Every structure is written in C-alpha cells, then in structure tokens.
Amino acid sequence: MKGNVIATIVALVIIGGAFYYTTRSPEVASTDNVAIENGKQIVEITAKGRYSPTLTAAKANMPTIVRMETNGTFDCTSQLTVPSIGYKQILPSTGTTDIELPPQKVGASVRGICGMGMYNFEVKFN
C-alpha cells in the first residue's frame, strides 16, 4: 500500500514537470538593454548570481560592445567565457568590462558562459 502511494506521487511529479516544461512560453529577447553610442551598439548584461537578461536581440552588421556590469559579484558568473571570440576572463567584483565584438551577420548569436557552465546569456543578431 505504502509503495503504491509513493509510486503515485512520483508519477504525478513527473507528469507535472513534463506539463510545465512543454507548455511554458519561450523566452522573449530583450532590447531594453541595447543602446547605440558613437556608431557602436552597446549591450548591457548584469552578472551577479546569473546573467540578466539571458537573451538579447541586437542589430546585425554593426560593431558591438557587450558591457558586463558587476556589483559585489563573487560567484561563478564573474568567470566569463565567450567561446566564439576566444574570450576568457575573470570580471572585477564591482565595475564594468567592455567586450568588443566585430559586426555579426544576420542570424548569428554570441553566447557567454560562466565558469561552472551553470549560467549563460545569448545575444542574437537580427
């Protein structure tokens, strides 16, 4: 009897999890963190406990700076890797770090990953 109750609870948790992951809406790309200054596109990403926003839409064919902002960041998000450009650095615990990207083609994306591989962000170019 006790085994049946446990099996039922486990089955409900699995079904509920599957329902949650298949019905949630896809993430919408942010544009609020993108500005154009002196002919360059600035994409601001905050690193503290996670990267925010995790998905950004930016303009293609334009020089871009990814501006990483930290404020008391002492977790794995301070160890940033951007594989597509060979960038790997430890960000300051507080401050800003600019990462220059060459103009990207339409449809390209650039992803940043934390030192443990737990958190990431992506900039998609349209």
Name the predicted role of every residue range.
Residues 1-44:
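Extracytoplasmic entry segments of secretory-pathway proteins
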Residues 47-54, 82-85, 98-99:
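N-terminal post-signal-peptidase region of extra-cytosolic proteins
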Residues 74-92, 122:
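Histidine- and aromatic-enriched segments that form or immediately flank copper-ligand environments
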